[in-house]
């Protein structure tokens, strides 16, 4: 039955009983005398009894039964005032009550007339009996209504706080500031059901003030229970402590799990203490209703740890203010989880007072004293969404049975606590060790705990400096978009510096073993490696090299091997170390062993230099001789070329013709540099240059000198081809000139000086013969070579002087006195080379022009016309033939 209907039925029953009592009293009065006449007034108007003090009220009634009960009486727990009884006066001097019907009826004239008939005591007895029966019926009805109402209210509270599946009992209550009380907070009304606080606790309870405030404001208790404030939903269940303490289903996940035999008060106090002493990541609910609730409903017990949150699968609805907040992400990690402790007795002695933070559990006060409300914790950093309830990490060896979970777990050994951020929740387990619970967003720093984080293996990368003037892909990343699993990454990539110590110790012990890499190293490691690579590439043994150095046989080794040996030459310090080494040669590397064998030969590397000079001497002498011979041949070719001389004549005549009337006219000679300018002077058509004209003139002159001149076209065609071939052959005729143009006389002179310097080194090596006791054949062979080398160098020197003289002569032959102004002695050959390359290009162009003319003339003459052709075609053919004949004659 709904509470409103129950209240309405109770009030109706009270009113009905009151009316029955009035009717019985009226009937009794009227029965003793005559019936009341209808014209007589109901209320007496002519007689007013004298005033008299009202009789004392009955022990079970406080007011008139016709008065409805006050809905907001400050005293009494949901019990409306009982219907009062009206004491019938024995004398007519009773003062009437203006608000009751029974008193008005008793003061009718019938009452006054009762004394005349002698029925006063009988009427009073009937009235008192009827009123008592009516009051008993009303009290019984109201008690039934109250029981029904209380049961419905308890069911509604359970539905609101626990949820349909008692999931609300597993929520962690939130704390709020202590200066605010929620309107409509329900306090226990059945002290017998759960052993609540004592009278002293209730006197100091703020809910007394709440009831007086509700009574003052006129707020109905049941109406407020039907429509609770939204702020009441995060509160934990308050009146199911006794049953939940022994419940096998919900005992582990409710805050009353740790309560003693006195109900759920101890667990609530522990929950309140943990909330007050923990950082703000434990809960995010209001901190104002919690202190008053814990002080009024639950007797204080020593707090152990904040109870773990229930699994999300058991909750159908998560209130918005009962979230655990661990940071900006919903994924919460439980580094160490608290273990449930056994039930604390109600008379447990208080522990010592709490030290400064990290906050330990507060000391539990005695049961007969009201606990002080804990200070409000700092506000949480953020409140996660309603749909993401964080899952606390379970201990590794926690049993799954809820009956076993209610039993105390064995004490857990101390764990290594990870560095915690400020938002980590600190709890204490059975052994007193501190356990931390951190969020994912706190894994990026040390958390201010001062403990260094475990070092992981490094990741070597190149960091890029962020620039503010351009947009980068890294600007799109958010700090909360991805979170790392700190435990997994530390387990996988821990930098094991301690296990790495034994290998280093083994390495130190192994250092005592002889090793050429550490103790027997003589050469630079890089140099030794290069020498070893060269030795493997040459595929030569130490014995072969030693024999060749002792005998002076350069042909046995070759110039490449000798050049490699020169590169292997050690420094003076390395040479001294290798010479003075008297240990085991097998302990040395391959490079050190090879150099040690070479250095055992007296003046080994000076011998190598002498043998390398001897091996390269013949090649260098031949190169110098060929170069000087080419210079002499170039001078002879340039002087004796008839076609080149004719070309110069054609250029001179053409230039004088073009320079008539100027200071440049009537020239008798010109520098060969002018030949490079012929291709720059272009004709009126924009294609033909002055060099084209000169080439065509030379071709025509060559055709004129042919022995047999004939009028046949074929003969003239062959003559024209012969003249073009003669001009084109000038480039091949002056081939030595082009070779000489690639030389540098200063370089050739430097080669000759180098040979003379090497010859001096050979002489210095031969002077060491007196100091050497072995390898005499080397000195004998070197003496023979020295005599021959001196003769060859003298010849080369003579050829050099002769070639240089020829070059000067040819320069004066073409340039006259201006040859002394030439800075480079071989420049004349370079000018002729460049002109010959341009001449070859012009000859190819002239040959294409002649070929085009021949094709056009031949196609016109081979054209045949049939006899049936018309005359205009014949006349056109004759005209075209005449034009072709004129062209041929003009070209010839």
Curated annotation (Swiss-Prot):
Compositional bias annotation for Low complexity: 87-111, 268-286, 297-306, 321-330
PROSITE patterns xref list: FH2 (PS51444)
Origin species: Oryza sativa subsp. japonica
Lineage per the UniProt record: Eukaryota, Viridiplantae, Streptophyta, Embryophyta, Tracheophyta
Coiled coil: none
A Pfam family the protein falls into: FH2
Membrane-spanning ranges: 126-146
InterPro entries attached to this UniProt entry: FH2_Formin, FH2_Formin_sf, Formin-like_plant
Protein name: Formin-like protein 8
GO CC terms, sorted: cytoskeleton; membrane
Membrane topology annotation: Single-pass membrane protein
Protein family: Belongs to the formin-like family. Class-I subfamily.
Alphabetical keyword list: Membrane, Signal, Transmembrane, Transmembrane helix
Leader sequence residues: 1-23
GO annotation terms (biological process): actin cytoskeleton organization; actin nucleation
Compartment annotation: Membrane
SS bond partners: none
Region (Disordered): 43-119, 188-457
GO molecular function, one term: actin filament binding
Taxonomic superkingdom: Eukaryota
């Amino acid at each position: 039955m709904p509470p409103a209907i129950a209240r309405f039925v109770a009030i109706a029953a009270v009113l009905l009983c009151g009316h029955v009592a009035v009717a019985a009293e009226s009937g009794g009065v009227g029965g003793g005398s005559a019936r009341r006449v209808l014209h007589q007034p109901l209320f007496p108007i002519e007689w007013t009894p004298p005033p008299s003090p009202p009789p004392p009220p009955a022990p079970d009634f406080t007011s008139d039964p016709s008065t409805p009960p006050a809905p907001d009486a400050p005293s009494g727990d949901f019990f409306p005032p009982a219907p009062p009884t009206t004491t019938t006066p024995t004398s007519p001097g009773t003062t009437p009550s203006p608000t009751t019907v029974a008193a008005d009826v008793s003061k009718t004239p019938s009452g006054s007339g009762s004394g005349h008939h002698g029925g006063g005591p009988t009427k009073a007895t009937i009235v008192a009996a009827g009123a008592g029966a009516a009051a008993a019926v009303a009290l019984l009805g109201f008690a039934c209504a109250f029981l029904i109402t209380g049961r419905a209210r308890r069911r509604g509270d359970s539905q609101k706080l626990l949820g349909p599946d008692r999931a609300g009992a597993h929520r962690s209550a939130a704390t709020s500031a202590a200066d605010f009380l929620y309107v409509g907070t329900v306090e226990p009304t059945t002290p017998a059901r759960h052993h609540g606080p004592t009278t002293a606790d209730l006197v100091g309870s703020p809910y007394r003030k709440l009831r007086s405030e509700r009574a003052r404001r006129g707020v109905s208790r049941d109406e407020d229970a039907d429509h609770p404030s939204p702020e009441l939903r995060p509160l934990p269940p308050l009146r199911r402590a006794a049953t939940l303490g022994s419940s096998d289903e919900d005992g582990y996940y409710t805050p009353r799990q740790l309560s003693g035999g006195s109900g759920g008060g101890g667990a609530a106090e522990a929950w309140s203490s943990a909330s007050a002493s923990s950082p703000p990541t434990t809960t995010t609910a209001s901190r104002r209703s919690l202190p008053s609730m814990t002080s009024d409903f639950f007797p204080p017990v020593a707090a152990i740890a904040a109870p773990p949150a229930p699994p999300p699968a058991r909750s159908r609805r998560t209130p918005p203010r009962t979230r655990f907040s661990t940071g900006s992400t919903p994924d919460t990690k439980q580094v160490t989880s608290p273990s449930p402790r056994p039930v604390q007795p109600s008379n447990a002695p208080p522990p010592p007072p709490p030290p400064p933070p990290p906050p330990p559990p507060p000391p539990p006060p005695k049961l007969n004293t009201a606990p002080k409300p804990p200070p409000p914790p700092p506000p949480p950093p953020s409140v996660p969404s309603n749909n993401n309830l964080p899952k606390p990490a379970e201990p590794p060896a926690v049993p799954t049975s809820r009956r076993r979970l209610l039993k105390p777990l064995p004490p857990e050994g101390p764990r290594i606590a990870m560095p915690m951020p400020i938002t980590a929740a600190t709890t204490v387990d059975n052994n007193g060790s501190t356990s931390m619970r951190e969020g994912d967003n706190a894994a990026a720093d040390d958390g201010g705990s001062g403990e260094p984080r475990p070092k992981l293996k490094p990741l070597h990368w190149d960091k890029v400096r962020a620039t503010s003037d351009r947009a980068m892909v890294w600007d799109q990343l958010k700090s909360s978009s991805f979170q790392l699993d700190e435990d997994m990454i530390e387990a996988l990539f821990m930098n094991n510096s301690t296990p790495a110590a034994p290998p280093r110790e083994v390495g130190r012990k192994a250092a005592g073993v002889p090793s050429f890499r550490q103790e027997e190293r003589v050469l630079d490691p890089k140099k030794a490696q290069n020498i070893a690579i060269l030795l493997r590439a040459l595929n030569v043994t130490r014995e072969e090299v030693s024999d060749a150095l002792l005998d002076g046989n350069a042909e046995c080794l070759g110039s490449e091997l000798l050049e490699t040996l020169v590169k292997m030459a050690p420094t003076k310090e390395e040479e001294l170390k290798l010479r003075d080494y008297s240990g085991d040669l097998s302990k040395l590397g391959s490079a050190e062993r090879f150099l040690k064998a070479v250095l055992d030969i007296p003046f080994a590397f000076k011998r190598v230099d002498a043998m390398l000079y001897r091996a390269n001497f013949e090649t260098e002498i031949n190169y110098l001789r060929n170069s000087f011979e080419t210079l002499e041949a170039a001078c002879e070719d340039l002087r004796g070329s008839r076609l080149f001389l004719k070309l110069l004549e054609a250029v001179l005549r053409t230039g004088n013709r073009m320079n008539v009337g100027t200071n440049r006219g009537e020239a008798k000679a010109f520098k060969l540099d002018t030949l490079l300018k012929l291709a720059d002077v272009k004709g009126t058509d924009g294609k033909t240059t002055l060099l084209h004209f000169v080439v065509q003139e030379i071709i025509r002159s060559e055709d004129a000198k042919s022995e047999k001149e004939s009028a046949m076209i074929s003969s003239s065609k062959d003559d024209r081809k012969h003249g073009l071939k003669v001009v084109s052959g000038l480039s091949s005729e002056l081939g030595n000139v082009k070779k000489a143009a690639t030389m540098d006389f200063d370089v050739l002179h430097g080669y000759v000086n180098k040979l003379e310097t090497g010859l001096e080194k050979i002489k210095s090596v031969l002077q060491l013969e007196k100091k050497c006791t072995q390898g005499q054949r080397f000195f004998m062979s070197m003496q023979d070579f020295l005599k021959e080398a001196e003769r060859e160098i003298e010849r080369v020197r003579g050829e050099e002087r002769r070639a240089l003289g020829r070059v000067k002569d040819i320069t004066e032959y073409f340039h006259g006195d201006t040859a002394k102004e030439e800075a480079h002695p071989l420049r004349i050959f370079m000018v002729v080379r460049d002109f010959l390359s341009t001449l070859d290009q012009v000859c190819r162009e002239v040959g294409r022009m002649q070929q085009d003319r021949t094709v056009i003339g031949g196609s016109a003459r081979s054209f045949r016309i049939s006899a049936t052709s018309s005359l205009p075609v014949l006349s056109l053919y004759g005209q075209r033939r005449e034009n072709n004949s004129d062209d041929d004659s003009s070209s010839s």
